[in-house]
Amino acid sequence: MGGDALTFKLFGLTFNTTNIVSGLIIYAIVFFTLYGMSRKIQMKPTGAQNVFEWLVDFTNGIVRSQMPASEQGHYSFFAFVLFVFIFFANQFGLIFQFHWNGAEVLRSPTADPVVTLTLSLMVMVLAFAAGVAHNGLGGYLKGYTKPFTLMLPVNIIEDFANFLTLGLRIFGNIFAGELLMSLIANMAFSHGILTIIPGLFLELAWQGFSVFIGSIQAYVFVTLTTVYISRKISE
C-alpha cells in the first residue's frame, strides 16, 4: 500500500485504473488456472484435478450447509466462482504490488472499499431478486413485517447493516494486511543490515498470515452470501 490509485476520466466519470487493471489480471489468472485444472478430466483424478474437485466440493459444502436442497443447484456454481475470485483477489497484493510515479498500479482489488461494497451490493441484489422470485413481490415485502409490523424499520436497517458489514469486513482485513506489509518493508530498509534481516523474517511471517486471513475472508464472504440468499428465500 501507499500512494494514490491511477485514475482516468471518461464521459465526466472518474474510473480507477488500478482496480480495473488488477481486476482484469485476476480474471485472467482465475480463468486460466481453472481451465488448466479441468482441461483433462480423468476418472481417477490426480494433481491439479484433485485440487479442482476439492474446491468444487468445498464450495458445494458451503451451499449445502446453508440452503434448502431444492435451491442448492441454482447457486453452487455462483458460490464456486465467487470464492475463487475473492481468494485470488485477496492474495494478489501479496505478490503483485507495483508503484509508478508515487501511484499504485497493481494491488489487491479487495483492499479498496469501492470494490468490496460493489461485491456486497451484487450479493444483496441477488438475494432480493431470489426472495421476490421465490415468494412473489407481495410475499417478499410482507417478510419485512415479520414477526410483527413494528419490526419493519429494524428489518430494513438489518439489510443495510448486512450490506455494509459484508463489504467492509473483507476490505478492512485486506487493507490492514497490505498496509502492515508495506510498513514492515519500510522498516526493513530504514537502518541497513540491522533491520533488513529481521524485517525479512517479519515480512515472510506476515505474508503467510495474510494468506490465511485472505482465505478465511473468502470463506466468510461466500458463507454469508449463501446465508443471506437462503434467508430471503425462506421469508
UniProtKB/Swiss-Prot annotation:
Gene Ontology molecular functions: proton-transporting ATP synthase activity, rotational mechanism
Subunit composition and interactions: F-type ATPases have 2 components, CF(1) - the catalytic core - and CF(0) - the membrane proton channel. CF(1) has five subunits: alpha(3), beta(3), gamma(1), delta(1), epsilon(1). CF(0) has three main subunits: a(1), b(2) and c(9-12). The alpha and beta chains form an alternating ring which encloses part of the gamma chain. CF(1) is attached to CF(0) by a central stalk formed by the gamma and epsilon chains, while a peripheral stalk is formed by the delta and b chains.
Keywords on record: ATP synthesis, Cell membrane, CF(0), Hydrogen ion transport, Ion transport, Membrane, Transmembrane, Transmembrane helix, Transport
Spans through the membrane: 17-37, 76-96, 113-133, 179-201, 211-230
Compartments (UniProt record): Cell membrane
Protein name (record): ATP synthase subunit a
SUPFAM superfamilies: F1F0 ATP synthase subunit A
Annotated function: Key component of the proton channel; it plays a direct role in the translocation of protons across the membrane.
GO cellular component terms, semicolon-separated: plasma membrane; proton-transporting ATP synthase complex
Main location: membrane
InterPro entries for this protein: ATP_syn_F0_a_bact/chloroplast (IPR045082), ATP_synth_F0_asu (IPR000568), F0_ATP_A_sf (IPR035908)
Topology versus the membrane: Multi-pass membrane protein
UniProt xrefs under PANTHER family: ATP SYNTHASE SUBUNIT A, CHLOROPLASTIC (PTHR42823:SF3)
Biological-process GO terms, alphabetical: proton motive force-driven plasma membrane ATP synthesis
Species this chain originates from: Limosilactobacillus reuteri (strain DSM 20016) (Lactobacillus reuteri)
HAMAP family: ATP_synth_a_bact
Cross-referenced CDD domains: ATP-synt_Fo_a_6
Family, per entry: Belongs to the ATPase A chain family.
